[in-house]
């Protein structure tokens, strides 16, 4: 799946998209959508949706996640897929297993506590 047409991109000052604002699903409320395609709490005002996305940002993508009982990290993502790996780093010898997931991320990819 790709980014739905009714998701409006929200970018940082440098132009990097950090999420979207869904104006359709919960209208008249707005749903901020993070970079993994996951909904945040609905809000009623556009500035509140932008603020929620700014707070969430991209930093959370550096966290560890759980996938199929494995600890993984996000290696790359775009508007069509998410690549996760069990490798601890991108060092040459640190191979690990890679998994390609559909975008948006489903519940099988969970943030580690």
Regions picked out by a protein language model, each given a short descriptive name:
Residues 15, 37-38, 106:
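Residue-level signal for glycine
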Residues 5, 96-113:
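Short, charged, intrinsically disordered terminal tails
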Residues 42-43, 90-100:
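A short macromolecule-binding patch
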Residues 1-23, 113:
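Short N-terminal "domain-start" leader segments
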Residues 31-33, 82-86:
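SH3/SH3-like beta-barrel fold
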Residues 20-22, 70-78:
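Short beta-strand-centered aromatic/proline hotspots
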Residues 2-10, 58-64, 82-83:
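Short, hydrophobic/aromatic-rich segments at coil-to-beta transitions
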Residues 28-63:
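Acidic, aromatic-enriched beta-alpha/helix-loop junctions
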């Amino acid at each position: 799946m790709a980014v739905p047409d009714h998701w409006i991109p929200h970018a940082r000052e440098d132009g990097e998209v950090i999420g979207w604002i869904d104006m359709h699903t919960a209208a008249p409320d707005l749903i901020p959508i993070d970079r993994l395609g996951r909904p945040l709490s609905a809000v009623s005002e556009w500035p509140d949706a932008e603020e929620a996305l700014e707070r969430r940002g991209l930093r959370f993508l550096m966290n560890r996640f759980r996938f199929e009982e494995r600890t993984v990290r996000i290696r790359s993502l775009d508007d069509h897929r998410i690549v996760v790996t069990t490798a601890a780093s991108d060092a040459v010898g640190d191979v690990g297993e890679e998994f390609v997931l559909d975008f948006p991320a489903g519940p099988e990819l969970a943030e580690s506590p």
